[in-house]
Design a protein with these regions (language model features):
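A short, conserved alpha-helix within the catalytic core of class I
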Residues: 145-156
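Short, conserved loop/helix-junction motifs that constitute active-site signature segments
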Residues: 76-80, 130, 156-161
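Basic, amphipathic N-terminal segments that precede the first structured/catalytic domain
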Residues: 1-19
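SAM cofactor-binding core of SAM-dependent methyltransferases
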Residues: 24-123
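Conserved proline-anchored active-site loop of SAM-dependent methyltransferases
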Residues: 44-56, 133-147, 168-171
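Short amphipathic alpha-helix with an adjacent loop that forms part of the alpha/beta core around
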Residues: 121-131, 154-157
Length: 265
């Protein structure tokens, strides 16, 4: 097994749970995509903050979102749709490590692209424009708010609202990573979500515009990092009730109050 590259990225005790839920959501969606009423025959599964594919939490190694995405797609047992994986990160060493780990883990080779998240989103937009039969399944797990491609994703959703699932994963550690250090004073960052380029103003609403729908995860009691996952869907609204997993409808009153909570209201 190759050695893990030491890169500048954070994690918390909730990282394992978050990564597992990415895999669970992916498997759920790809089981849905088996329906004959799903009209797209090619899906791009993208993570534009892919990292190394592994997180170190104390003395435990936890698989990251790219690995959980691959597992979710393979676990859905859906062989009727062509799937292309698109992984990118701004760090060359992280991309190299991820490529090696995927080969070791799955015995397949998937290209990893060294680029800014904003450039990756623009490239994915060009891919969508090139073929009307392509659907995009996009995970956003940013390294820092300055890198978060809010405007690019918004523009993409305006142009292709029915052809994209967007699953943002945001935590307070993104703010700390951007600042270059954790909050040594121990202060809780009440408004961290709003600080991501006014994440709540325009972006959250764009996730469910033009007939789109989505969920937001209820806050975890005692989670000082305040991470949240906001899975949103372009078509085929999931029939599964994930309320037992603490997801609520993003457009419901509870969903709106949850957004306010994460924005420090």
């Amino acid at each position: 097994m190759s050695e893990i590259v030491k890169t500048f990225q954070g994690s918390s005790v909730h990282t394992k749970r978050k990564e597992q839920e990415i895999g669970g959501l992916t498997k759920m969606r790809f089981n849905q995509f088996k329906s004959p009423y799903f009209k797209f025959n090619n899906i791009y599964v993208a993570d534009v903050f892919s990292g190394t594919g592994r997180n170190v939490i104390i003395d435990e190694i936890v698989d990251g979102s790219p690995i959980k995405l691959i597992e979710g797609v393979m676990g859905a047992n859906n062989r009727n749709i062509d799937v292309n994986f698109f992984f990118s990160d701004v760090r060359t060493d992280a991309c190299e490590q991820l490529h090696k780990y995927i080969v070791e883990r799955f015995k397949i080779s998937i290209a990893t692209n060294v680029m800014l998240a904003s450039d990756a989103i623009n490239m994915l937009g060009s891919i969508l424009k090139s073929n009307p039969n392509i659907f995009l399944y996009l995970v956003l797990d940013p390294n820092g708010p300055k890198d978060f491609p809010k405007n690019e994703v918004h523009d993409l959703l305006c142009e292709f609202p029915k052809r994209i699932d967007v699953i943002p994963n945001i935590s307070a550690t993104t703010i700390n990573r951007c600042l270059g250090a954790r909050d040594k004073a121990g202060r809780q960052m009440q408004g961290w979500l709003a600080n991501i380029e006014n994440f709540d103003e325009g972006f959250v609403s764009s996730l469910t515009m033009k007939g789109r729908c989505g969920w937001i995860r209820r806050p975890i009691k005692g989670d000082r990092f305040r991470w949240v996952i906001v899975p949103t869907f372009g078509c085929f609204k999931p029939k599964n009730n994930w309320e037992k997993q603490d997801y609520v409808d993003l457009n419901s009153e509870e969903g709106k109050e949850t957004v306010k909570f994460y924005c420090g209201a």
